């Protein structure tokens, strides 16, 4: 029984990691931002992604 719990834990960690990677997608021009790194190829100026 313990093996099933272990396998499930590993799968849950992998699933969470994949979701986190997808969630870190960049924001397009005009999107709200806090840091330059949030914008795809733009800068964060006045809380908006600018080219």
Swiss-Prot record:
GO terms for molecular function: calcium channel regulator activity; toxin activity. Residues 1-23 form the signal peptide. Keywords: Calcium channel impairing toxin, Disulfide bond, Ion channel impairing toxin, Knottin, Neurotoxin, Secreted, Signal, Toxin, Voltage-gated calcium channel impairing toxin. Disulfide bonds join 26-40, 33-44, 39-49. One of its GO terms (cellular component) is extracellular region. It comes from the Eukaryota. The keyword Signal applies. Expressed by the venom gland. Is the most highly expressed peptide and is around 3000 times higher expressed in the thoracic glands compared to its body tissues. Its main location: secreted. It is found in: Secreted. Induces neurotoxic effect on honeybees, including slow movements, disorientation and paralysis. Since it provokes similar symptoms than omega-atracotoxin, it is probable that it acts in the same way by inhibiting voltage-gated calcium channels. Belongs to the asilidin-1 family. The presence of a 'disulfide through disulfide knot' structurally defines this protein as a knottin. This is U-Asilidin(1)-Mar1a. The lineage of its organism: Eukaryota, Metazoa, Ecdysozoa, Arthropoda, Hexapoda.
């Amino acid at each position: 029984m313990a093996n099933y719990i272990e396998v499930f834990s590993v799968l849950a960690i992998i699933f969470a990691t994949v979701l986190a990677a997808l969630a870190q997608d960049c924001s397009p021009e005009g999107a709200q931002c806090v840091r330059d790194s949030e914008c795809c190829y733009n800068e964060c100026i006045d809380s908006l992604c600018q080219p």
